[in-house]
Amino acid sequence: MFRSIFPWLAALLLAGPAFRAAGAEEIKPPFNLRWGETSERMARLLTGAKARIVARRNVEGREAWDVEGLVQVGLKRTVFYFIGGELVEVELQYQKPDWDETKYDGFMGDVRRRLEQRYGQGQLISRKKEPEGDVMQTLVGWKWNQNNTAIELIYFAAQSPKQVFRTLSVHYKTY
């Protein structure tokens, strides 16, 4: 099982310099980006990477771009968030249809341990499992803060008797 998790973990850890920061350094966004990148420059970078902006929307006063086509194992979608045309958050959404709950748990545990090695003990921000009608919803989240920047690691699952949806996301944020 862990052999299949390690390629995902390696890809996640290579996603950007945020995992290589030490001490109280600012957490940097993935893909060698910088906080405050302009939306114009991001559009050019995404075009150069042959990625597609599949949707643009407004989320809580921020412009959000749903992007597909960034090459990374298991990465289904990346969401870039802008305020005033400047990058303030990057959300990496990982999904693999052939993974069960145990594989997601193992992957999340490995990522959490790596983050703790870099940034110390994370803060548990959510751990709940509760029904919503005939759907059982699970939400587990951890957060690490450094110098007005943060990483959140979130697992979400919704399971009914006939369907299941699972996703793991890593949110890089600046405040």
Report each predicted region and the residues it spans.
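Residues at beta-strand starts and edge strands
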Residues: F6, K76, E86-V88, T138, ...
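Mid-chain, structured segments of secreted extracytoplasmic proteins
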Residues: W65-G109
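Compositionally biased, intrinsically disordered/low-complexity regions enriched for serine, proline
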Residues: S4, L14, E26-I27
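Bacterial N-terminal signal peptides
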Residues: W8-P17
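Non-cytosolic coordination micro-motifs
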Residues: G23-G61, Y94-Y175
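Bacterial N-terminal signal peptides that target proteins for export
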Residues: M1-L9
